[in-house]
Amino acid sequence: MTAPSKPVLVADIGGTNARFALADVDASVPLLDDTSREFAVVDFGSLGEAARYYLDQIGVQATQGVFAVAGRVDGDEARITNHPWVISRSRTATMLGFSTLHLINDFAAQAMAISLLRPQDVVQVGGASWRPAPIDQARNYGVIGPGTGLGVGGLIIRNGRCFPLETEGGHVSFPPGTPEEIRILEILSEQFGRVSNERLICGPGLVNIHRALSEIAGVDPGPLQPKDITARAAAGDPRSSRTIDLFCAIFGAIAGDMVLMQGAWDGVFLTGGLVPKVLDSLQHSGFRQRFEHKGRFSAIMSKVPSLAVMHPHAGLLGAAAYAVDAQRQHPGEQR
């Protein structure tokens, strides 16, 4: 590994694991993949301690950082639900001896990653073909990702600058599109009261859909995990297969609604831990039909590309993209 002369430490901090890598803001491929490492958060008392351990392990000293955090960033602090760390930007920067440290939301990082994605990093799920455009070309993108929850965001590119949109679109009310989905909504309403998109389109959402289908059929499915449903679907179980089909169709409807709300005409990027696991189903399901089925806008929607992000470290890539964008805005900051 050859470290850049002025490396930027980038991180993707989740509820269970912390991933670190180095970035070179002057390189054509800023994220240095061979420097990435992953650690369990429970093994360290703080974010600064984990970051220092990483830097010591690879033998590099950085003075700049961009850390993406799976939680809300409020001023100097970031909070992650059920997380052992209290993350303070100023205290972490002081501990590491950093002159500059940015804390950003993890889905802002997912959005920023779009600016560095290459064709080999994505798989087409429908619509017009997509290729990266010059940074000075105006574009509007959407990003949506089911994992433990449902993240929704966007990226606006103007005059060579990237502006991530941080939203809570996963908590928008679920709009059923078929009689079957209306019945599922009724069942979930009895359990949750208000039903958001996140109640269906995420890992636990797979379980919610399956349980609703089981109740409709008058059977008890027993204890279930999302991985049980995907495994049973792969083995040909009809109810699990129907669960995956509904998941993909509803996912498509929600992603299409996001395009209309954000004006994300240049493409929607599907990210998150579940996407690679259901990729084949997304490509051969009702995802695109529901994505495009938007009344008077159906013809326009048919041209909007939807792309599954397959980059293994999209969060780190987005943190690196943020560092590159900061360099464009304040050239002296990263020097």
UniProtKB/Swiss-Prot annotation:
Listed Pfam families: Glucokinase
Keywords: ATP-binding, Cytoplasm, Glycolysis, Kinase, Nucleotide-binding, Transferase
Location(s), subcellular: Cytoplasm
SUPFAM superfamilies: Actin-like ATPase domain
GO BP: glycolytic process
Example of a GO cellular component annotation carried by this entry: cytosol
EC number: 2.7.1.2
One example GO MF annotation: ATP binding
Enzyme category, top tier: transferase
Catalysis performed (reactions): D-glucose + ATP = D-glucose 6-phosphate + ADP + H(+)
Binding positions for ATP per the UniProt entry: A11, D12, I13, G14, G15, T16
Transmembrane spans: none
Domain of life per record: Bacteria
The keyword Nuclease appears for this protein: no
Major subcellular location class: cytoplasm
InterPro entries found in the cross-reference section: ATPase_NBD (IPR043129), Bacterial_glucokinase (IPR050201), Glucokinase (IPR003836)
Family: Belongs to the bacterial glucokinase family.
Protein name according to UniProt: Glucokinase
Organism: Xanthomonas euvesicatoria pv. vesicatoria (strain 85-10) (Xanthomonas campestris pv. vesicatoria)
